[in-house]
């Protein structure tokens, strides 16, 4: 994102145009977007963003916040793409058969048998349905992925 676009977004939050976003301006802007945050949480949010400690969010501080939001969104998109590689029928779950198929196509020795794949899935299957949903997949990927799960089979 270029600086001009960031400045436009900042100006939408900076209602009075004084170059800084107050707690009230942040609250009003978020509410206009349909986001309602309790007052104490808003204070904490500003304290995290407010690097110079003046009690306001200026354009530089806002840029850091916006960058963090965008990076998290990009990571989520990457994670979704990876999940979709395994979720071959696009039903929102990775089954034992789908896992075995993908691992085999990658030429990995982990997961050659259905039993291996069942064990791998059971290590991350929080809800016990025998499949991996997107939330479970994200948790697993943060721990090293399916290959890490298979290393101690």
From Swiss-Prot:
InterPro entries associated with the record: EF-hand-dom_pair, EF_Hand_1_Ca_BS, EF_hand_dom, EF_hand_pair_protein_CML-like
Alphabetized GO MF terms: calcium ion binding
Stored CDD domains: EFh
Keywords linked to the UniProt accession: Calcium, Metal-binding, Repeat
Transmembrane segment boundaries: none
Taxonomy, superkingdom: Eukaryota
Protein name per the record: Calmodulin-like protein 3
Record: residues binding Ca(2+) 1: 14, 16, 18, 20, 25
One Pfam family matching this protein: EF-hand_7
Binding residues annotated for Ca(2+) 4, in chain numbering: 125, 127, 129, 131, 136
């Amino acid at each position: 994102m270029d600086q001009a676009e960031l400045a436009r977004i900042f100006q939408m939050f900076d209602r009075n145009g004084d170059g800084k976003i107050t707690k009230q301006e942040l609250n009003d802007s978020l509410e206009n977007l349909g986001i309602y945050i309790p007052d104490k949480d808003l204070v904490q949010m500003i304290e995290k963003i407010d690097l110079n400690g003046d009690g306001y969010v200026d354009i530089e501080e806002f840029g850091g916040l916006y960058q963090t939001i965008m990076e998290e969104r990009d990571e989520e998109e990457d994670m979704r793409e990876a999940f979709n590689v395994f979720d071959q029928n696009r039903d929102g779950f990775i089954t034992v058969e789908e896992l075995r198929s993908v691992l085999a196509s990658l030429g990995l020795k982990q997961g050659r048998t259905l039993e291996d794949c069942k064990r791998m899935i059971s290590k991350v299957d929080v809800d016990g349905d025998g499949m991996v949903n997107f939330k479970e997949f994200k948790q697993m990927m943060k721990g090293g992925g399916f290959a890490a799960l298979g290393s101690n089979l």
